Amino acid sequence: MLITLEGIDGAGKSTLYEGLKTRLQDLEPVFTKEPGSPLVNSAVRREIGANRDPFAEATLFVADHAAHLAQVVLPALEEKKLVISDRYSDSRFAYQQVSLIGIVPDPKAWLTAVHAGWSVRPDLTILLLISPETAMNRLHERPGKEHFEDPAFLEEVQKKYLERVTEDPERFLLIDAAQEPETILDFVEKSIRALPRQ
């Protein structure tokens, strides 16, 4: 079973991810994240920090996803393990669909085409929803800054996430990320434990 954690920067994905690592040890899940492939991840981070090209950045994220699937996700799923990933393909359909506007004619169609036939659909996606203003307040407390951290940009990204929900509603569990982290963790843990095991 593949479970993914999604949401805009500052929504609390990493906090939830780390909490689940502690809470779900008895299930022996494989915890992973994107970007995660060591070689591609370093290139992605360089691109984010440099004079970036959104198309090059998007292709690097797709390459990382391919490596992540081949090296981590598919082997674990073949062994019938529970896989929990901090970010996955929905991040591309949210972030890159916005960043590629004006660069490719139809960002959604391009992203759909490059993922078609090989990317694996998650069994459950936990989407943390929060106002961009609250997310920005949280991000300002973090060291470092990435170009994605802009309230107008984050608002558009969250809209793209919600479009994904409309297209595949049965896959998503929506969470109000303005709640206390422990409240969110309790609810998500119970939700995961209630899932039928494959």
Swiss-Prot record:
Q: What gene does this protein come from?
A: tmk
The domain of life for this entry's organism is: Archaea
From the UniProt record, give one GO term of the biological process aspect: dUDP biosynthetic process
The family database entries (SUPFAM superfamilies) matched by this protein are listed as: P-loop containing nucleoside triphosphate hydrolases
- Which amino acids does the record list as binding ATP? G7, I8, D9, G10, A11, G12, K13, S14
Any one GO MF term held by the record is:
dTMP kinase activity
InterPro entries attached here? P-loop_NTPase, Thymidylate_kin-like_dom, Thymidylate_kinase
UniProt family annotation:
Belongs to the thymidylate kinase family.
Q: Which GO terms describe its cellular component?
A: cytoplasm
Q: Which cysteines are joined by disulfide bonds?
A: none
Q: Which reaction does it catalyse?
A: dTMP + ATP = dTDP + ADP
Q: Which UniProt keywords apply?
A: ATP-binding, Kinase, Nucleotide biosynthesis, Nucleotide-binding, Transferase
Q: What is this protein called?
A: Probable thymidylate kinase
Q: Upper taxonomic classification of the species?
A: Archaea, Methanobacteriati, Methanobacteriota, Stenosarchaea group, Methanomicrobia
As recorded in UniProt, coiled-coil segments are none
Keyword Transferase recorded: yes
Enzyme Commission identifier(s): 2.7.4.9
